[in-house]
């Protein structure tokens, strides 16, 4: 305990390491972190002095430069936080190897197969002129805050290629090929003890003295597959700004939706929503550290601090919560949105829960999804589904089917269906309370109606119309067809003059048929009362 206090006062113990060598964790002596950290201009104490807040402690080996001496001068409270500008960025997902067959006739001694060579390709974005160089089996050193790489042999260093500013540029250098037959198996991966990186891609900004000390570094390793082929996998990325090295870490839960060409169509139905995983309403804007899951809104994150200390995604304990908020300048164009998006429209509601005091004047907060991908227009090829109230019957399908005797007698089973027609010609949801009230009113009206109005006692051979049902004589009839309609003749005539009529078919009695609008002609014989 006393040694820790003494280190806080006297400073960090000097480490026996060369000034230009890369720093490795854990140190031989002393501590890397202190008992507190600064974030957003505020000071926070941590119960884990040697815990890396943005990842695992072993990730510090990719940082390279030595830690800052402590204690150091803290910025004033009124001094604003300086925003770092990244002038160049290499898209690590686009890093790949391209196979080339050796043009020479030389083949390996052990096998007669032709030798296969590989070159490196990737995409990058830059806001300034940049010079890109590839290094294989390289060592890392630091001089005046800049990373300097040197390979084991000059043949493992590519020529420097210069590019102008632009986005989505393709790096391809077929003249620099890698022959893995000359590599040992242990040289394909990163060796922490030796400090040798299998592949280093260094992009140095070369656009005048104003941007001196800016660079982007991509560290990668190689993998050998069962079939003998090789692939490259990114390890870490570093951004050097004003001769200070920063380690880039991924944020899980936010991605560039515009760069989805490489993904299969099976991922189209995956969960790409940007709502909070707890409340499922507000947009997610809070990052959980050190797992780096962006899955909470500000309100749910504040509640989670006092209820639990585990991430809702990976269930690992978290040590800090970081709210990330994007802002943009208020312009006349932002007042009239080009299109409407249900997800992005929640940003206006989300701002009500956020603290507006930290927003600079003249700016407005926007969602991270909109800041990364912009406003996505709604596809016109997918029409919106109409509501129940918007569906109207045009009457072109024939005469409407009127109520049968079973419905007139108040059988509620005949009124049930997936969609019931309302008096105004619209279809409402079966579970709608309005539909239930209409059914009850209709049943009460039908129960009060006289049974004589259902069907007259005598049906003449001529055409008669009874409640919208046309009676036509002389058509063949079948009892099986009447059963298929779900309506029996006895139910129609059971209340005629309060007497029950028999259903015995008589050849002398005229028959009346009930015709329904359908693709086939259905008829039902009814004996005259």
Swiss-Prot record:
<keyword id="KW-0863">Zinc-finger</keyword>
<dbReference type="Pfam" id="PF13920">
    <property type="entry name" value="zf-C3HC4_3"/>
</dbReference>
<feature type="compositionally biased region" description="Polar residues">
    <location>
        <begin position="449"/>
        <end position="463"/>
    </location>
</feature>
<comment type="pathway">
    <text>Protein modification; protein ubiquitination.</text>
</comment>
<keyword id="KW-0479">Metal-binding</keyword>
<feature type="zinc finger region" description="RING-type">
    <location>
        <begin position="275"/>
        <end position="314"/>
    </location>
</feature>
<dbReference type="GO" id="GO:0016567">
    <property type="term" value="P:protein ubiquitination"/>
</dbReference>
<protein>
    <recommendedName>
        <fullName>Probable E3 ubiquitin-protein ligase MGRN1</fullName>
        <ecNumber>2.3.2.27</ecNumber>
    </recommendedName>
</protein>
<dbReference type="GO" id="GO:0045879">
    <property type="term" value="P:negative regulation of smoothened signaling pathway"/>
</dbReference>
<dbReference type="GO" id="GO:0005634">
    <property type="term" value="C:nucleus"/>
</dbReference>
<dbReference type="InterPro" id="IPR013083">
    <property type="entry name" value="Znf_RING/FYVE/PHD"/>
</dbReference>
<dbReference type="GO" id="GO:0005737">
    <property type="term" value="C:cytoplasm"/>
</dbReference>
<keyword id="KW-0862">Zinc</keyword>
<feature type="region of interest" description="Disordered">
    <location>
        <begin position="396"/>
        <end position="529"/>
    </location>
</feature>
<keyword id="KW-0808">Transferase</keyword>
<feature type="compositionally biased region" description="Polar residues">
    <location>
        <begin position="520"/>
        <end position="529"/>
    </location>
</feature>
<keyword id="KW-0833">Ubl conjugation pathway</keyword>
<keyword id="KW-0832">Ubl conjugation</keyword>
<dbReference type="GO" id="GO:0045744">
    <property type="term" value="P:negative regulation of G protein-coupled receptor signaling pathway"/>
</dbReference>
<dbReference type="GO" id="GO:0005769">
    <property type="term" value="C:early endosome"/>
</dbReference>
<dbReference type="InterPro" id="IPR001841">
    <property type="entry name" value="Znf_RING"/>
</dbReference>
<feature type="compositionally biased region" description="Low complexity">
    <location>
        <begin position="501"/>
        <end position="511"/>
    </location>
</feature>
<feature type="region of interest" description="Disordered">
    <location>
        <begin position="341"/>
        <end position="362"/>
    </location>
</feature>
<feature type="compositionally biased region" description="Polar residues">
    <location>
        <begin position="477"/>
        <end position="487"/>
    </location>
</feature>
<dbReference type="GO" id="GO:0061630">
    <property type="term" value="F:ubiquitin protein ligase activity"/>
</dbReference>
<dbReference type="InterPro" id="IPR045194">
    <property type="entry name" value="MGRN1/RNF157-like"/>
</dbReference>
<dbReference type="GO" id="GO:0008270">
    <property type="term" value="F:zinc ion binding"/>
</dbReference>
<dbReference type="GO" id="GO:0008333">
    <property type="term" value="P:endosome to lysosome transport"/>
</dbReference>
<comment type="function">
    <text>E3 ubiquitin-protein ligase. Also acts as a negative regulator of hedgehog signaling.</text>
</comment>
């Amino acid at each position: 305990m006393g040694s820790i206090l003494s280190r806080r006062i006297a400073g960090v113990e000097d480490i026996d390491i060369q000034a230009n060598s890369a720093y490795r964790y854990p140190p031989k002596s002393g501590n890397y972190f202190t008992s507190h950290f600064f974030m957003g201009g505020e000071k926070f104490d941590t119960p884990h002095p040697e815990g890396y807040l943005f990842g695992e402690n072993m990730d510090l080996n990719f940082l390279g430069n030595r830690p800052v001496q402590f204690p150091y001068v803290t910025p004033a409270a009124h001094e604003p936080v300086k925003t770092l500008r990244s002038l160049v960025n290499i898209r690590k997902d686009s890093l790949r190897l391209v196979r080339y067959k050796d043009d020479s006739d030389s083949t390996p001694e052990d096998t007669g197969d032709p030798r296969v060579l590989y070159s490196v390709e990737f995409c990058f974005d830059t806001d300034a002129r940049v010079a890109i160089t590839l290094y294989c089996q390289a060592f890392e050193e630091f001089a005046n805050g800049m990373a300097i790489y040197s390979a084991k042999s000059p043949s493992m260093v590519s020529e420097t290629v210069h590019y102008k500013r632009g986005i989505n540029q393709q790096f391809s250098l077929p003249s620099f090929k890698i022959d893995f037959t000359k590599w040992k198996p242990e040289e394909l991966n990163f060796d922490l003890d030796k400090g040798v990186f299998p592949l280093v891609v260094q992009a140095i900004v070369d656009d005048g003295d104003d941007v001196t000390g800016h660079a982007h570094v991509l560290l990668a390793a190689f993998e050998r597959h069962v079939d003998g082929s090789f692939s490259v996998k990114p390890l870490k990325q570093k951004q050097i700004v004003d001769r200070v090295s920063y380690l880039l870490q991924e944020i899980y839960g936010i991605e560039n939706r515009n760069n989805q060409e490489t993904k299969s169509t099976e991922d189209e139905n995956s969960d790409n929503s940007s709502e909070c995983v707890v409340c499922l309403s507000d947009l997610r804007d809070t990052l959980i550290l050190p797992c780096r899951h962006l899955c909470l809104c500000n309100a749910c994150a504040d509640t989670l601090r006092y209820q639990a200390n585990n991430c809702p995604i990976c269930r690992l304990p978290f040590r800090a919560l970081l709210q990330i908020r994007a802002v943009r300048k208020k312009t006349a164009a932002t007042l009239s949105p080009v299109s409407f998006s249900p997800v992005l429209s929640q940003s206006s509601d989300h701002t009500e829960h956020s603290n507006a005091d930290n927003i600079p004047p003249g700016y407005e907060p926007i969602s991270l999804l909109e800041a990364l991908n912009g406003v996505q227009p709604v596809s016109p090829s997918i029409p919106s589904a109409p509501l129940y109230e918007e569906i109207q019957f045009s009457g072109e399908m024939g005469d409407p089917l009127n109520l049968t005797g079973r419905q007139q007698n108040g059988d509620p089973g005949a009124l049930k269906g997936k969609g019931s027609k309302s008096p105004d010609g619209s279809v409402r949801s079966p579970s709608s309370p309005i539909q239930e009230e209409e059914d009850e009113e209709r049943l009460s009206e039908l129960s009060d109606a006289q049974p004589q109005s259902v069907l007259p006692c005598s049906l003449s051979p001529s055409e008669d119309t009874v409640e919208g049902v046309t009676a036509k004589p002389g058509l063949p009839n079948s009892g099986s067809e009447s059963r298929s309609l779900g309506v029996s003749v006895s139910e129609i005539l059971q209340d005629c003059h309060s007497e029950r009529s028999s259903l015995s078919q008589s050849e002398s009695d005229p028959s009346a048929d009930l015709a329904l609008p359908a693709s086939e002609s259905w008829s039902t014989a009814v004996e005259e009362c």
